[in-house]
Amino acid sequence: HEAMVGILALEAKRAQALIVGEDLGTVEPWVREYLSRRGLLGTSVLWFEAGMQGEPLDAQWWREYCMASVTTHDLPPSLGYLAGDHVRLRDQLGILTEPLSDELAAAAREQADWLGKLVADGVLDEAKRDDPVEVMLALHRFLLRTPSKVLLANLTDAVGERRAQNQPGTIDEYPNWRVPLADQNGHRMSLEDVFAAQLPQRLAAVMNGLPEQPVSRWT
């Protein structure tokens, strides 16, 4: 792996590009340390970042050399995740490993922990914790408090989509990578619709640390 990473680093230097390693899941600890030492970014997903007792990890303890995001293509977008769609979908597909009620209860506890964290950290108004759109924006606002080098917002979150683009553990059971982009009401969205909608502008403002997003020169 030394030679392969060396070649990747050299080509990235020549192209003035970043390399991001997908080091989620069952990856040995030395891999993350090695990526950091060689200047390659790892991957951090908010729902997977937890402290020693399983509590939401404080922003200050997130890795610096990583690309941080709220969700990933292997999970439903934030609005779907907050609604428990990731649990119900696996149940419908017959790939849920625990009773549905237990999984939903665990998801509710996870969500409650994060809501409490967002409110305590001042990125979510207590009065808005029942509004999934406001929670989604607050989750991204939390990312800005981490030291992570690169922050990522998903297009599906920007438009309010709820459906997962990919469901691990399936082949023909789910239309992986064939889900048309839609807003939170299920209406399909074209590229022009994305630029005209309000939610993408709100999320862009959050990611830029602004109260509102400036008018784009592309519109």
Regions found by a protein language model. Give the residues of each.
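Catalytic cores of glycan-processing enzymes that make or break glycosidic bonds
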Residues: 1-219
